[in-house]
Design a protein with these regions (language model features):
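C-terminal structural segment of proteins
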Residues: 1-315, 320, 325, 369, ...
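Signature of N-terminal electron-transfer/Fe-S-associated modules in redox systems
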Residues: 10, 68, 75-76, 230, ...
């Protein structure tokens, strides 16, 4: 991994001080699902200074305050997806978070990262703009607040200054009659970026007519925006298929006006119209509720001190002393600050069961449990496990024995070449710890971040289901 100076902070004030000192040569580290890939590849965008803010507890969590809901930028997408507060007031945001990446990615990736990366395909930004969200940017000079829609200049560029930190995302609670939906179109159901997406909200009056409409497409315009021309078509009208189809065509036309005709237009022009129509139909067809994808857990940043502080300098990555519990054993380790958890486990601790596959978080071969959550160890910086518990395949069962999952995999011939098996077992354990009797769909969703090139998955699904049955 490319060398860098590593600095860990534990308060917003410390983060602002570090940004003031280093500015444009600094990149923030929270979940690290994008940054660690850049560092490993030696990307030109790779920074000289990595500022680890994952331990700033005041930037995590979801809070209700009067008529508003506030999101900490360190809140993970897994936490958004299972939030009862969002399920009640903003289900479209939870739906968008649940569509991101894989269980391993959602356990690490943060809302702040999804916003500040400013990728046109960011799934949670359209729902937040539909909700009327604002963001707070803070520096040593003070705070400023602006509408989320005004934050973006163009893809991958925001109006935040080099010394500013995103510290809060806030939106008003929708009215009790508001219904919403989020639709994403990708190449597969997991680990796929959005080719197109739509966030939609509708509010109906007592007479059944539409009194409020919001439509925000994703990956369709240069930056995210409400398509007010399409929204105006809906106001005062009775909802119906023909009306929604007209709104979809209007969105499609506005997209062409903004982007012109390109190689992808032939596909996107009809598809965005259909997605808009379907999203509006879903607003009426459901109350926006869904089954939580995982058990509620405390935010990552509340699990103890994270990271290790080092002097402010431009020397190559110094070593860090970390303390963690790995497979039930408390350990104190001195590691390079630029080492990831995968290399720590395999090369320094002699635990080769965790496999090195794609190294970009797409195959799941390196999956371990971090405080019970499945994560890609290739995308976790080793200093970030301080104060936390790591479980690898070697720690699944007592020495000389097998875990019920391992026995079930053998009984169902679910391990062929075996390369994916350790990660698959850990993802399955996280699922069964939450729900001992999962449905077929829940099993497939839980292992959606683990690729197998041998079995076709059916034997794996059967093995997990069998291991979860009592007796």
């Amino acid at each position: 991994m490319k060398p860098f100076e590593y600095i860990a902070v534990h308060t917003i004030a410390e983060a602002c001080d570090a940004l003031a000192a280093h500015g444009a040569e600094t990149r923030l580290l929270a979940g690290g699902t994008d940054l660690l890939i850049e560092l490993r590849r030696g990307s030109k965008k790779a920074p000289r200074v990595v500022l680890d803010i994952s331990g700033v507890a005041e930037m995590a969590g979801i809070a209700e305050s009067g008529a508003h809901i506030t999101l900490g930028p360190l809140t993970t997408h897994a936490e958004l997806a299972r939030s009862e507060l969002l399920l009640e007031f903003a289900p479209l945001l939870g739906e968008a978070a649940a569509a991101i990446g894989s269980p391993q990615i959602r356990a690490r990736a943060t809302e702040g990262g999804n916003i500040m990366n400013a990728a046109a395909c960011a799934d949670t930004v359209p729902p937040l703009i539909a909700l009327g969200a604002t963001v707070t940017l803070q520096s040593k000079a003070g705070c400023r607040e602006l509408a989320l829609a005004d934050l973006f200049v163009k893809p991958y560029q925001t109006r935040a200054n080099a010394d500013e930190l995103l510290t809060a995302v806030r939106f008003p609670k929708p009215g009790p009659g508001t219904r919403s939906a989020f639709i994403k179109l990708g190449r597969r159901n997991a680990l796929a970026i959005s080719r197109l997406s739509v966030a939609a909200m509708l509010e109906l009056g007592k007479d059944g007519r539409i009194t409020e409409a919001r439509i925000v497409p994703g990956a369709a315009f240069p930056t995210w925006q409400r398509v007010t021309e399409a929204e105006r078509l809906l106001l005062g009208e009775m909802p119906g298929e023909l009306l929604f189809a007209a709104a979809g065509r209007k969105v499609s036309g506005e997209m062409i006006k903004a982007t012109g005709r390109r190689w992808s237009t032939e596909y996107k022009e009809p598809v965005i119209a259909v997605l808009v129509s379907r999203a509006l139909e879903q607003c009426l067809a459901k109350a926006g509720q869904r089954v939580p994808a995982a058990p509620a857990k405390e935010p990552i940043s509340a699990k103890g001190q994270v990271g290790c502080a080092v002097p402010l300098s431009h020397s190559p990555s110094p070593e860090c002393v970390i303390t963690a519990t790995i497979n039930g054993r408390p350990l104190t380790l001195t590691v390079p600050a630029n080492m990831n958890l995968l290399d720590l486990l395999r090369d320094h601790l002699g635990l080769p069961g965790t496999k090195c596959g794609c190294e970009i978080g797409e195959c799941g071969a390196c999956t371990v449990l971090l405080d019970g959550e499945p994560v890609n160890s290739c995308l976790v910086l080793a200093p970030q496990i301080t104060g936390r518990q790591v479980l690898t395949v070697e720690g699944l069962a007592p020495e000389g024995g097998l875990h019920p999952l391992q026995e079930s995999f053998l009984d169902h011939d679910a391990a062929h070449c075996g390369f994916c098996t350790p990660g698959m077992l850990l993802s399955a354990k996280a699922l069964l710890d939450w729900n001992p009797r999962p449905t077929d769909g829940e099993i497939r969703r839980a292992i959606s971040g683990n690729l197998c090139r041998c079995t076709g998955y059916q034997q794996i699904v059967e093995a997990i289901a069998s291991a979860g049955l009592p007796g």
